Amino acid sequence: MAKENVYSSLGEHRKKFMSWQMRTILVTMIGYAIFYFVRKNFSVAMPGMTAEYGITNKSFGWIIFFGSLTYGFSRFVNGYTVDRYKGRLVMALGLLLCALSNFAFGYGANLSSLITGVDSGPDFINILILVMGVTIIVNQFFQGMGYPPCARILPHWIHPSELATKMSIWNCSHSIGAALAVVVCGYLIGSMGTDLSNNAEVVAAIQGNLDANGVKDAANQALVYAAHIGAWKWCFYVPACLALVGAIGIYIGLRDEPKEVGLPDLPDTGLGGLKDGGMSAARRKKFEAVMVWKNRWVWTFCIANLFVYVVRMGVLDWGPKFLTEARGLDIKSATWTTAAFEIAGIIGTLFAGWATDHFFKGKGHRMCVVCMAGAALFMTIFRFLPADAGITPIAATLVGAGFFIYGPQALIGIELGNQATKEASARANGIAGILGYLGSGLAGLLVGYIADFFGWTAVFETIIVVAIIGMFILISMWKAPRDGYERAASINYNNE
């Protein structure tokens, strides 16, 4: 149905409806981007915490692992919460609580000193890691209150005939938020803090921490970090303040449904016979069994999603750290490079969708194979860059990797909807989401351990292997159909 035909039936309400539609899209995009400001700031703060306290990659890995699992659980729980409460209330409250947890993280060192009575030593560090871990896990639970409200609110304002197009644009919000987060926090950590670079004892302590963690050019890096003691805290304070403002903006700017502002519902979006009971419970159970639980294409996509997330989060979560420690970049250059990886992902996502329709006739799984091969290729180039490679080749290879890895991340969700059909899309994507968050957690755990015990080169090699495995998993479904509607039509309900 053409856009004009869809909205022209709203009559005199059309202009007001379109205004509220644009407002809803913009507010949710900005709001969800701010969620990433109080989520991805941790990645930028990690190098500073290693320098000042000697926190190991293994410890960070465990924090990321449990945080990712908590986020996945929260997304699942809050998917039900938004059906009972106003989506704008859940989203605004979630961002408010994220702001408070970020303030708490910034004061983590003070709290650890209060608990232990000291501000250094093994006991202090252990309590600090515990406090940070608990705070990140709590923050990740509140993070899970961000996406479900958007998934519920937007279909009330956007007609199904253009939902995919506008949601693909909306989906760039997390990439925009993550990119801006690492850039802003990179500036803060390189500009704020107390200058103790003239204190030989402080510089020596920092160099010892960096040497213990295998940081490249530790002597010069120690002077840089000593000039900005405590700057990592600002990576939490500033985004937290932004989140407070964002929470207020979300609550004021959003409305869950058109009727809340005196507008009619979108035409042709009633529940219809299927959701009103047209399919019996027994038939629905069999439908989901065939289209989801016994659908090998669904499971292939879900398993591949785990590998996609390991590659993506292995770079995004750890980028600032391995670029400073393994490649010797300063923190500002490292964060700009990580941001470029994320921005390239936006372009790659849009290109992957376009290429799927124009070159592969809607068969997104084939485009995913190309993307995983591209990601593996660019990570291989990155692995073999010379030790003295400048920022240009380093950034170029990570931009290439980002361009390719974000294609599968977006396409898998769309393709699951096609393979499971729209009636079982949510269930199929739920499974993929759980495995994706597991992959994110494993990326944190694996990278932390491998970096500490085998070095960053082994980390890059692991990411390459994971990308190749993901590619072969997707190759196994090269001959899969474009969608599962023919399969759904052939289900035999006679023996239900």
Tell me the role of every PLM-derived stretch.
Residues 7-18, 260-300, 492-496:
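Juxtamembrane intracellular "pre-TM" segments in multi-pass secondary transporters
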Residues 40, 68-76, 178-179, 342-350, ...:
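Residue-level signature of mid-helix packing/kink "hotspots" within the transmembrane helices
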Residues 42-46, 295-350, 409, 444:
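Extracytoplasmic gate region of multi-pass secondary transporters
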Residues 84-95, 358-372:
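Cytoplasmic membrane-interface "Motif A"-like loop-to-helix N-cap segments
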Residues 96-125, 373-387:
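C-terminal ends and interior cores of transmembrane alpha-helices
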Residues 135-174:
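Cytoplasmic helix-loop-helix junction between adjacent transmembrane helices
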Residues 165-193, 345, 433-443:
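Glycine-rich segments within core transmembrane alpha-helices of 12-TM secondary carriers
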Residues 362-412:
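C-terminal transmembrane helical hairpin of 12-TM major facilitator-type secondary transporters
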